[in-house]
């Protein structure tokens, strides 16, 4: 994810990591950053998720990466989450997920809908691994409510 969708990609990775108690390695990147290293670890167990922007110019670059990945496929799966109709996406993606929000939206607002896909994937993966999503880390390394953090008073200067 890029710009406003970078946060969605980051939260997607974090949620999957959290709900699978670290048994599923995750990462996020921009389409440019992904080409410079992370793409090299893709194997037949990998699901790559691409979030497409509603910005027509930006979407061209995002689709270029999806096309590149589809043509270099190594048995991995590709999911593409998008709002508007996207010609040819069904042939490129194993899981074309269209979340029709309607009119063009700012990426930040699209993210509110797009994150539901990631949360569902994380939940289903957690259950498939026999991990309880309500308490994925019973040993306490990761807690639902962060512990051990002190909130210090802040004075506006």
Language-model features, listed with the residues they occupy:
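A SIS-like phosphosugar-recognition module
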Residues: 1-157
């Amino acid at each position: 994810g890029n710009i406003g969708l970078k946060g969605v990609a980051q939260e997607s990775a974090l949620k999957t990591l959290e709900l699978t108690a670290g048994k599923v390695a995750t990462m996020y990147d921009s389409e440019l950053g992904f080409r410079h290293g992370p793409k090299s670890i893709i194997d037949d167990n990998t699901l790559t998720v691409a979030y497409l922007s509603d910005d027509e110019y930006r979407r061209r670059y995002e689709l270029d990466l999806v096309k590149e990945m589809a043509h270099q496929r190594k048995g991995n799966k590709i999911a593409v989450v998008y709002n508007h109709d996207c010609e040819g996406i069904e042939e490129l993606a194993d899981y074309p997920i269209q979340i029709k929000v309607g009119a063009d939206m700012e990426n930040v607002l699209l993210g509110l809908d797009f994150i539901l896909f990631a949360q569902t994937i994380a939940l289903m993966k957690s259950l498939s691994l026999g991990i309880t999503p309500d308490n994925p880390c019973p040993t306490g390394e990761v807690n639902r409510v962060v512990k051990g953090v002190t909130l210090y008073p802040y004075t506006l200067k």
